[in-house]
Amino acid sequence: MAFSDFSLTVLGSRGSMAFGGEQCSRYGGDSSCYMVRAGEETVFLDSGTGICAAPSSYPKDPVVLLTHLHLDHIVGLGMFPALSNRELRVKIYVPFCRTREEAEGSLGRIYAPPFWPVRLTEYTSSPELLPLPDQLTLGALQIDAIPGNHPGGCMVFRLRYEGKSIVYVTDYEYEESSFERLVRFAEGADLLLFDAQYEDAELPAKHGFGHASAGQGIELMERSDAKRLLLIHHDPQSFDRVLAQRETLLTHKKVEYARTGQRIVL
Protein backbone atom coordinates (compact mmCIF):
# COMPACT_ATOMS: atom_id res chain seq x y z
CA MET A 1 0.00 0.00 0.00
CA ALA A 2 1.29 3.43 -0.92
CA PHE A 3 1.24 5.73 2.09
CA SER A 4 -0.88 8.24 0.16
CA ASP A 5 -3.74 5.73 -0.15
CA PHE A 6 -7.12 6.19 1.50
CA SER A 7 -8.81 2.81 1.61
CA LEU A 8 -11.33 0.68 3.48
CA THR A 9 -11.07 -3.09 3.87
CA VAL A 10 -14.02 -5.17 5.04
CA LEU A 11 -12.85 -7.55 7.76
CA GLY A 12 -16.36 -8.44 8.89
CA SER A 13 -19.85 -7.20 8.02
CA ARG A 14 -22.16 -9.70 9.71
CA GLY A 15 -24.63 -8.20 12.19
CA SER A 16 -25.88 -9.33 15.61
CA MET A 17 -23.56 -12.33 15.74
CA ALA A 18 -20.91 -14.05 13.64
CA PHE A 19 -22.01 -17.01 11.55
CA GLY A 20 -19.74 -19.44 9.70
CA GLY A 21 -19.96 -22.25 7.19
CA GLU A 22 -20.19 -22.67 3.44
CA GLN A 23 -23.45 -20.73 3.35
CA CYS A 24 -21.48 -17.57 4.27
CA SER A 25 -18.38 -18.14 2.14
CA ARG A 26 -19.15 -15.39 -0.41
CA TYR A 27 -20.17 -12.45 1.80
CA GLY A 28 -18.46 -13.62 4.97
CA GLY A 29 -19.59 -14.54 8.46
CA ASP A 30 -17.39 -12.39 10.71
CA SER A 31 -19.05 -9.62 12.69
CA SER A 32 -18.48 -5.91 12.24
CA CYS A 33 -14.97 -4.60 11.63
CA TYR A 34 -13.63 -2.29 8.90
CA MET A 35 -10.00 -1.29 8.49
CA VAL A 36 -9.37 2.22 7.16
CA ARG A 37 -5.91 3.18 5.92
CA ALA A 38 -5.14 6.87 5.46
CA GLY A 39 -1.48 7.29 4.61
CA GLU A 40 0.38 5.86 7.61
CA GLU A 41 -2.70 6.00 9.85
CA THR A 42 -4.75 2.86 10.48
CA VAL A 43 -8.21 3.05 12.04
CA PHE A 44 -10.51 0.15 12.83
CA LEU A 45 -14.23 0.84 12.84
CA ASP A 46 -15.56 -1.53 15.51
CA SER A 47 -13.94 -4.74 16.68
CA GLY A 48 -16.21 -7.67 15.96
CA THR A 49 -14.73 -11.06 15.08
CA GLY A 50 -13.35 -9.59 11.84
CA ILE A 51 -10.57 -7.81 13.74
CA CYS A 52 -9.00 -11.19 14.57
CA ALA A 53 -7.72 -11.33 10.97
CA ALA A 54 -6.14 -7.85 11.10
CA PRO A 55 -2.37 -7.41 10.68
CA SER A 56 -0.12 -7.37 13.74
CA SER A 57 2.22 -4.56 12.63
CA TYR A 58 1.60 -1.02 11.32
CA PRO A 59 3.57 2.09 10.27
CA LYS A 60 2.05 3.95 13.25
CA ASP A 61 0.07 2.95 16.33
CA PRO A 62 -3.40 1.79 15.20
CA VAL A 63 -6.64 3.23 16.55
CA VAL A 64 -9.92 1.42 17.26
CA LEU A 65 -13.15 3.45 17.15
CA LEU A 66 -16.15 1.75 18.76
CA THR A 67 -19.64 2.82 17.71
CA HIS A 68 -21.21 1.13 20.75
CA LEU A 69 -20.57 -1.78 23.08
CA HIS A 70 -23.00 -4.45 21.90
CA LEU A 71 -21.17 -7.77 21.82
CA ASP A 72 -21.08 -8.24 18.05
CA HIS A 73 -19.06 -5.02 17.77
CA ILE A 74 -16.48 -5.75 20.48
CA VAL A 75 -16.25 -9.55 20.71
CA GLY A 76 -13.06 -9.78 18.62
CA LEU A 77 -11.10 -7.15 20.50
CA GLY A 78 -9.39 -9.60 22.84
CA MET A 79 -7.91 -11.43 19.83
CA PHE A 80 -6.74 -8.30 17.96
CA PRO A 81 -3.16 -9.25 16.94
CA ALA A 82 -1.80 -5.74 17.49
CA LEU A 83 -2.51 -6.00 21.22
CA SER A 84 0.30 -8.55 21.45
CA ASN A 85 2.87 -6.38 19.65
CA ARG A 86 5.05 -4.68 22.27
CA GLU A 87 6.25 -2.13 19.69
CA LEU A 88 2.74 -0.67 19.39
CA ARG A 89 0.50 1.35 21.69
CA VAL A 90 -3.06 0.74 20.50
CA LYS A 91 -5.61 3.45 21.28
CA ILE A 92 -9.21 2.31 21.77
CA TYR A 93 -11.88 5.02 21.81
CA VAL A 94 -14.99 4.07 23.78
CA PRO A 95 -18.31 5.90 23.25
CA PHE A 96 -20.58 7.35 25.93
CA CYS A 97 -17.71 7.84 28.39
CA ARG A 98 -16.33 11.06 29.89
CA THR A 99 -13.10 9.79 31.45
CA ARG A 100 -10.42 7.14 30.98
CA GLU A 101 -11.74 5.41 34.08
CA GLU A 102 -15.22 5.17 32.57
CA ALA A 103 -13.76 3.87 29.29
CA GLU A 104 -11.76 1.19 31.09
CA GLY A 105 -14.76 0.29 33.23
CA SER A 106 -17.11 -0.03 30.25
CA LEU A 107 -14.97 -2.58 28.41
CA GLY A 108 -13.74 -4.03 31.69
CA ARG A 109 -17.15 -5.49 32.38
CA ILE A 110 -16.52 -7.94 29.53
CA TYR A 111 -12.74 -8.05 29.15
CA ALA A 112 -11.90 -9.21 32.65
CA PRO A 113 -12.28 -12.44 34.64
CA PRO A 114 -14.45 -14.47 34.71
CA PHE A 115 -15.52 -13.63 31.13
CA TRP A 116 -11.99 -13.06 29.75
CA PRO A 117 -8.67 -14.19 31.25
CA VAL A 118 -6.96 -10.77 31.31
CA ARG A 119 -7.92 -7.11 31.21
CA LEU A 120 -7.25 -5.18 28.00
CA THR A 121 -4.80 -2.92 29.83
CA GLU A 122 -2.70 -5.98 30.70
CA TYR A 123 -1.92 -6.89 27.08
CA THR A 124 1.66 -6.61 25.78
CA SER A 125 0.96 -3.38 23.90
CA SER A 126 -0.54 -1.71 27.02
CA PRO A 127 -3.44 -0.24 25.02
CA GLU A 128 -4.96 3.09 26.01
CA LEU A 129 -8.72 3.11 26.59
CA LEU A 130 -10.04 6.61 26.01
CA PRO A 131 -13.42 8.36 25.87
CA LEU A 132 -14.57 8.90 22.28
CA PRO A 133 -14.55 12.63 21.39
CA ASP A 134 -16.84 14.34 18.89
CA GLN A 135 -13.78 15.16 16.78
CA LEU A 136 -10.43 13.45 16.45
CA THR A 137 -7.39 14.31 14.32
CA LEU A 138 -4.79 11.70 13.38
CA GLY A 139 -2.21 13.36 11.17
CA ALA A 140 -4.08 14.42 8.03
CA LEU A 141 -7.07 12.23 8.91
CA GLN A 142 -10.05 14.06 10.44
CA ILE A 143 -12.78 12.06 12.20
CA ASP A 144 -16.18 13.40 13.28
CA ALA A 145 -18.75 11.52 15.35
CA ILE A 146 -22.48 12.09 15.91
CA PRO A 147 -25.16 9.94 17.58
CA GLY A 148 -27.37 7.72 15.44
CA ASN A 149 -30.52 5.90 16.60
CA HIS A 150 -30.14 2.50 18.24
CA PRO A 151 -31.19 0.96 21.58
CA GLY A 152 -28.58 2.06 24.11
CA GLY A 153 -27.03 4.48 21.63
CA CYS A 154 -24.64 4.13 18.69
CA MET A 155 -22.25 6.58 17.06
CA VAL A 156 -21.91 7.46 13.38
CA PHE A 157 -18.48 8.35 11.99
CA ARG A 158 -17.21 10.45 9.11
CA LEU A 159 -13.53 10.10 8.17
CA ARG A 160 -11.95 12.75 5.91
CA TYR A 161 -8.56 12.49 4.22
CA GLU A 162 -7.09 14.52 1.36
CA GLY A 163 -10.48 15.66 0.08
CA LYS A 164 -12.13 12.22 0.28
CA SER A 165 -14.52 10.92 2.93
CA ILE A 166 -16.06 7.74 4.35
CA VAL A 167 -19.27 7.72 6.40
CA TYR A 168 -20.02 4.70 8.62
CA VAL A 169 -23.65 4.19 9.70
CA THR A 170 -24.16 0.89 11.49
CA ASP A 171 -26.90 -0.24 13.88
CA TYR A 172 -29.29 2.50 12.85
CA GLU A 173 -33.09 2.56 12.89
CA TYR A 174 -34.98 5.15 10.87
CA GLU A 175 -36.33 8.10 12.82
CA GLU A 176 -37.15 11.31 11.00
CA SER A 177 -35.06 13.86 12.91
CA SER A 178 -31.99 11.62 13.15
CA PHE A 179 -32.29 10.70 9.47
CA GLU A 180 -32.30 14.37 8.48
CA ARG A 181 -29.15 14.80 10.57
CA LEU A 182 -27.58 11.85 8.73
CA VAL A 183 -28.42 13.41 5.36
CA ARG A 184 -26.46 16.52 6.33
CA PHE A 185 -23.64 14.55 7.95
CA ALA A 186 -23.14 12.27 4.91
CA GLU A 187 -23.36 15.04 2.31
CA GLY A 188 -21.05 14.35 -0.63
CA ALA A 189 -19.38 11.31 0.95
CA ASP A 190 -17.26 9.25 -1.42
CA LEU A 191 -18.21 6.03 0.37
CA LEU A 192 -21.24 5.44 2.59
CA LEU A 193 -21.54 2.29 4.71
CA PHE A 194 -25.12 1.70 5.88
CA ASP A 195 -26.90 -0.88 8.02
CA ALA A 196 -29.16 -3.00 5.77
CA GLN A 197 -29.90 -5.92 8.08
CA TYR A 198 -33.56 -6.15 7.05
CA GLU A 199 -35.67 -5.84 3.93
CA ASP A 200 -38.17 -2.99 3.73
CA ALA A 201 -41.10 -5.40 4.21
CA GLU A 202 -39.59 -6.67 7.48
CA LEU A 203 -39.22 -3.28 9.13
CA PRO A 204 -42.68 -3.02 10.79
CA ALA A 205 -42.19 -6.37 12.55
CA LYS A 206 -38.64 -5.38 13.55
CA HIS A 207 -39.54 -1.98 14.98
CA GLY A 208 -37.36 -1.17 17.96
CA PHE A 209 -34.62 -3.62 16.99
CA GLY A 210 -32.37 -0.76 15.89
CA HIS A 211 -31.62 -1.66 12.28
CA ALA A 212 -32.43 -0.49 8.77
CA SER A 213 -32.84 -1.67 5.16
CA ALA A 214 -31.19 -1.31 1.78
CA GLY A 215 -34.04 0.92 0.65
CA GLN A 216 -33.35 3.35 3.46
CA GLY A 217 -29.65 3.27 2.66
CA ILE A 218 -30.35 4.13 -0.97
CA GLU A 219 -32.57 7.00 0.16
CA LEU A 220 -29.74 8.33 2.32
CA MET A 221 -27.28 7.94 -0.56
CA GLU A 222 -29.52 9.84 -2.96
CA ARG A 223 -30.45 12.64 -0.57
CA SER A 224 -26.89 13.18 0.63
CA ASP A 225 -25.34 12.84 -2.85
CA ALA A 226 -22.99 10.13 -1.60
CA LYS A 227 -21.07 8.58 -4.48
CA ARG A 228 -21.03 4.91 -3.46
CA LEU A 229 -23.04 2.79 -1.01
CA LEU A 230 -21.84 -0.35 0.75
CA LEU A 231 -24.64 -2.24 2.51
CA ILE A 232 -23.50 -3.77 5.79
CA HIS A 233 -24.55 -5.53 9.02
CA HIS A 234 -25.95 -8.59 7.26
CA ASP A 235 -28.47 -10.56 9.29
CA PRO A 236 -27.04 -13.88 10.62
CA GLN A 237 -29.73 -15.76 8.70
CA SER A 238 -29.14 -13.90 5.43
CA PHE A 239 -26.88 -16.48 3.85
CA ASP A 240 -25.05 -16.07 0.53
CA ARG A 241 -28.03 -17.08 -1.58
CA VAL A 242 -30.24 -14.50 0.16
CA LEU A 243 -27.77 -11.63 -0.21
CA ALA A 244 -26.96 -12.60 -3.80
CA GLN A 245 -30.66 -12.53 -4.64
CA ARG A 246 -31.07 -9.11 -3.01
CA GLU A 247 -28.06 -7.84 -4.92
CA THR A 248 -29.64 -8.80 -8.25
CA LEU A 249 -32.56 -6.52 -7.40
CA LEU A 250 -30.37 -3.46 -6.88
CA THR A 251 -30.73 -1.00 -9.74
CA HIS A 252 -27.96 1.40 -8.69
CA LYS A 253 -24.54 0.58 -10.14
CA LYS A 254 -22.79 2.13 -7.13
CA VAL A 255 -24.66 0.04 -4.52
CA GLU A 256 -23.53 -3.39 -3.31
CA TYR A 257 -23.49 -5.70 -0.30
CA ALA A 258 -20.20 -5.82 1.60
CA ARG A 259 -17.98 -8.90 1.30
CA THR A 260 -15.29 -9.92 3.77
CA GLY A 261 -11.88 -9.18 2.23
CA GLN A 262 -13.23 -6.48 -0.06
CA ARG A 263 -10.93 -3.44 -0.35
CA ILE A 264 -12.09 -0.10 -1.68
CA VAL A 265 -9.55 2.58 -2.58
CA LEU A 266 -10.89 6.11 -2.71
Predicted features, each with a name:
Residues 1-167, 182-183, 243-266:
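Binuclear metal-dependent hydrolase catalytic cores
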Residues 45, 67, 169-170, 194-196, ...:
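Active-site flanking residues adjacent to catalytic metal/cofactor-binding acidic residues
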Residues 95-97, 171, 234:
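Short strand-loop junctions, especially beta-strand C-caps/beta-turns
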Residues 174-261:
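Cap/insert and terminal regions of metallo-dependent hydrolase folds
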